[in-house]
Amino acid sequence: ILLIYNGLIIAGAVAYWAAGMTPFDAINISMCAVPTGGFATHGESIAYWNSPVIEAITIVLMVAGGTNFLLLFLLLRGKLKAFLTHIETPLYFGTIAVMALVVAGFFLGQGVSGDGAEALRQGTFQVVSILTSTGFQTIPSFADLGPALLFLFGLLMLVGAEARSTSCLLY
């Protein structure tokens, strides 16, 4: 499990660096994305870079950090069917997919995002960040999102990510 954890952090740091982050930022953000700690080296969080590539890397790392590490181990051992059919996998990824679409709709309706692609990207990012308890942001503020969306975000925090992940240590 430690090899998976460290491997994700190293791969994330390299990907961030390749995407334009300084080595300092790349290492630190990766070390906060995988363990879903969410600390950022800039006050604007991930929005500082204004980069869809960096956002995509962060989504992948947060999703990996929120995935049951025993399931990641199975996946790395080539047991794709065991990974996909485990009860947590479709629920976790299904929740992300459905809620990303819902939040994207809210973002479009409230003018947070300029178009559908941006709304889907930002919606997916915020859903994954909240569901995994990471706390990274790509939008300026939650203050103007309205009570319905804030309530939905609160529910996502309660649902959380998978057991035996960096987000949830329940056994």
Give short role names for the model-derived ranges.
Residues I1-Y171:
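Membrane-proximal intracellular helices of multi-pass ion channels
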